[in-house]
Design a protein with these regions (language model features):
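Short hydrophobic/aromatic-enriched beta-strand-loop microsegments
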Residues: 68-73, 118, 134-136
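A basic- and aromatic-enriched beta-loop-alpha substructure that forms the phosphate/nucleotide-
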Residues: 91, 98-107, 117, 121-126, ...
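A short, gly/pro- and small-residue-rich
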Residues: 108-117, 148-155
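PLP-dependent aminotransferase-like
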Residues: 5, 9-22, 34-112, 124
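A short, well-structured juxtamembrane/interface segment
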Residues: 32-35, 223
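PLP-dependent aminotransferase class I/II
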Residues: 6-16, 20-27, 54, 93, ...
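Structural motif
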Residues: 49, 91-94, 117, 135, ...
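Active-site PLP attachment segment
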Residues: 131-172
């Protein structure tokens, strides 16, 4: 539905949409919680299997919907122990921890298809899986108020309302060098984020269309190699990144 434009008054924030989203084939929602909520509403699973090492944002939507969830164990290398095999009407959530479990989640996705939900919030530059649901988060990588990308969804209602309940106060204060104040505002904003299924805000959509993604990806890899070189003697997890 096209939004009516007002005439007169003052000028809006000027942001040119210079390019396009990195995730053109995904559906852009507000955050990872909204993506997961959409999947749960669509599939209506009887049971969802989730790892013990997980953010509460994963299981809170299940509690709100009255969906039973069961934890499974992982070892110190972030590998599942006795991974449950989802039966008909059940879902298995896999966390691609820090983007390090790519081969594993790919293999499980091929085995169980749409019964697998992959939390890819630590791997922004992956564009989904051919068989399974997955989602990633823009807010974990960039200074935007909202934004997450859902893959594997079909027949999605494109008339879902856009998110307008956003704040960029913390982003602006950090830009101005007011880190401590910005962090307090960030925590307040985080607490305000819900699980309602809404499309990404127009502000985040435009901001994310202006980013030089290739340069950003290269710089993130350089940063990783620098930190890894300093800390590798303490790290018990084998890390291989190009």
């Amino acid at each position: 539905m096209k939004q009516q434009q007002s005439i007169g008054g003052f000028f809006e924030l000027e942001i040119a949409q210079l390019g396009h989203s990195y995730h053109l084939d995904a559906f852009a929602l507000t955050n990872g919680r909204a993506c997961l909520s959409w999947i749960l509403e669509r599939e209506k699973p009887s049971i969802v299997y989730i790892p013990y090492y997980v953010c509460s944002a994963i299981y809170i939507p299940m509690e709100k919907m009255g969906i039973k969830y069961v934890f499974y164990d992982i070892d110190i290398f972030l590998n599942p122990i006795n991974l449950p095999e989802p039966q008909e009407g059940e879902l298995l959530v896999l966390i691609n921890y820090f983007g390090l479990k790519n081969n594993f989640v790919n293999n499980i996705s091929k085995m169980w298809g749409k019964q697998v939900v992959i939390d890819d919030t630590h791997r922004f530059f992956n564009r989904g899986y051919s068989n399974s649901y997955s989602f990633t988060s823009a807010r974990k990588y960039f200074g935007v108020p909202d934004g997450a990308y859902l893959y594997g969804a079909s027949n999605i209602n494109t008339e879902i309302d856009r998110n307008k309940n956003i704040s960029v106060i913390h982003n602006v204060k950090r830009l101005l060098g007011l880190q401590e104040q910005a962090y307090e505002d960030y925590l307040t904003y985080e607490d305000s984020l819900g699980y309602e299924i809404k499309r990404i805000s127009i502000l985040s959509e435009k901001l994310l269309s202006c980013l030089p993604y290739s340069d950003i990806a290269r710089k993130r890899i350089e940063n990783f190699h620098f930190v890894h070189e300093e800390l590798k003697e303490y790290n018990r997890i084998s890390i291989n990144i190009s």
